[in-house]
């Protein structure tokens, strides 16, 4: 793409099309300058960070809220703008750092990032929020499918990690909130996902869906 200053730049494009009668009628998305990638991506895992995740979630909320609805307040189209937010917190991460050292903990985070990426589609977004917390944004997905995908992610993260000469067992507690909840803001979705994750962790549920 050409920058406003007239120079050629490489960009990353992420977008979501809206369909009417099977025909794409509009698209919303974002372009990011890859030269500025460093400030928006996590250096350890090479995943998007909190700002990019929040920006994409805000776009999906706007699309979902603007979708045509029927008399019951349910999206009239076939879930094209539905989405789900997952918050994942690794189990026993502090113990891994304390026992094996931070270098092993860092490699564990890198392996978790790659497993998460392998569990989602190209339209989805995986981000590292802070420490051992990750968010996943699943696009164009209904609540039942989102719950199934969260269970698949939980199973993938529970498998042993081989890091050097060590075999590490971790896994994750996952909170899930679907756009079917019709929450109004980014912070509302993140708080709901956090509450569900906390319940999953304290009650050893693996995955907990916000109700």
What are these regions (language model features)?
Residues 126, 152, 156, 166, ...:
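Cyclic nucleotide signaling catalytic output domains
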Residues 15-18, 32, 159, 177:
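Output-coupling edge of small sensory domains
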Residues 1-19, 23-25:
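Per-ARNT-Sim (PAS) sensory domains and their PAS-associated C-terminal
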Residues 45-84, 91-121, 127-131, 135-139, ...:
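Conserved long alpha-helical elements within nucleotide-processing catalytic cores of c-di-GMP signaling
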Residues 23-34:
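PAS-family sensory domains
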Residues 32-39, 49:
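PAS-associated C-terminal cap
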Residues 17, 63, 118-123, 155-167:
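Short catalytic/binding micro-motifs of nucleotide second-messenger systems
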